Amino acid sequence: MDKNAIKKFAVWARTELIARVSLKGVEYGITEDNIEDANADSVGGKVLTADEKKQRQALIAEINSKGYKQVMEEVAYTWFNRFSALRFMEVNGYLPSHVRVFTDEENNFKPQIITEAIHLDMDGLDMEKVYELKDAEKTEELYKYLLIVQCNALNKILPGMFQKIADYTELLLPDNLLREGSVIQQMIELIPEDDWKDAVQIIGWLYQYYNSEKKDDVFAALKKNVKITKENIPAATQLFTPDWIVRYM
């Protein structure tokens, strides 16, 4: 297992995901310094759907409760976890659909879930929407839709990892996931496929390395007599998650 590659990806992915998630927030009139009217029907000239309006209101409420940075970090980490779990499952043939989400069967960055979209059989899949997006050649939008449906379908067997995505985490799913240099592309490029095979401990290493910079920041602050907040306790107390614990989780 190439732990250097895993660390390189995880550390970079945290920064990248927080930035991308935050960028989606801007699209909906939400920044660290300013939040537009929570009841707005449109933001930046874009008319919100009923679902978007509801999700945006939930996001704003969460930010008011926890703070902007904390919420952006939580959403970024949620998607990191989901991407990691999906990659592990597709490589090991654990996805119920047996259709890869990130690559084709040769491990090329050509998601099989897109090429097989009209043949998919997943709970919650609106085939009419699939055809509509395919006919309009909205590949990126189609991919995001299929990704969300796949996560929701996995809720039945892994409810802890794949909670139903009907809230602001869907709203903040980053754009351009199919581009060169995206988090998904880099995950495939940097971490050898063999490292995912039957080695569930990779999830533990990803977790540890993802939080490593934050952990360093927390302890650096401690040396300056800055107390650890409840939000930073997980990063400060993290330990490597061995194989048997990951399987139990």
Predicted regions, residues:
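Preference for the N-terminal adenyl/adenosyl cofactor-binding alpha/beta module
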Residues: 1-248
